[in-house]
UniProtKB/Swiss-Prot annotation:
Binds to the 23S rRNA. SUPFAM superfamilies: L9 N-domain-like, Ribosomal protein L9 C-domain. The keyword Nucleus does not apply. NCBIfam families: L9. One of its GO terms (molecular function) is structural constituent of ribosome. Gene3D superfamilies: Ribosomal protein L9, C-terminal domain (3.10.430.100), Ribosomal protein L9, N-terminal domain (3.40.5.10). This is Large ribosomal subunit protein bL9. It comes from the Bacteria. It comes from Aliarcobacter butzleri (strain RM4018) (Arcobacter butzleri). Keywords: Ribonucleoprotein, Ribosomal protein, RNA-binding, rRNA-binding. PANTHER family: 50S RIBOSOMAL PROTEIN L9. One of its GO terms (biological process) is translation.
Length: 148
């Protein structure tokens, strides 16, 4: 009997694969436990339609991420920070500050976890920060840190 795996099954295959299995194993274990569906033409057509939807959605997400990357590469973010007597910042610029400033100045929302500050920003100047946008797409954001 042919089954369409709904979930990953150890030693058999991954979700979405079609496998030929013994009737008893397919009916009693795989279908009985909700790990697979009987691979009828109806089920296979629905599965293909879902796969097309997922592929289309992923293409749209990639296009949006690329568009956002272009926007961020051309953006220069300005962050005002308190400065001490010696010209160094009081504290340092954090991922959260960068994320909040992006949202306030450009209405771009990026999670602070996706902003990679290699070294802490502790002095006034212009810095480049890597932003992870998903689907292996990255953008370089320029940050201008100025005195408050």
């Amino acid at each position: 009997m042919k089954v369409l795996l709904i979930k990953d099954v150890k030693s058999l295959g991954k979700a979405g694969e079609i496998k030929e299995v013994a009737d008893g194993y397919g009916k009693n274990f795989l279908i009985g436990k909700g790990l697979a569906l009987h691979a009828t033409t109806d089920v296979l057509n629905k599965h293909k339609a879902e796969q097309k939807k997922l592929a289309l959605k992923e293409e749209q997400e990639i296009a949006q991420a690329k568009e956002l990357a272009e926007k961020l590469n051309a953006t220069k973010l300005t962050i005002k920070h308190k400065v001490g007597a010696n010209g160094h910042l009081i504290g340092s610029v954090t991922n959260k500050e960068v994320s909040d400033a992006l949202e306030q100045q450009f209405s771009i929302m990026i999670d602070k976890k996706n902003i990679a500050l290699d070294n802490k920003i502790k002095t006034i100047g212009i810095y480049e920060v890597d932003c992870k946008l998903g689907h292996s797409i990255h953008a370089k954001l320029k940050i201008d840190v100025i005195a408050e």
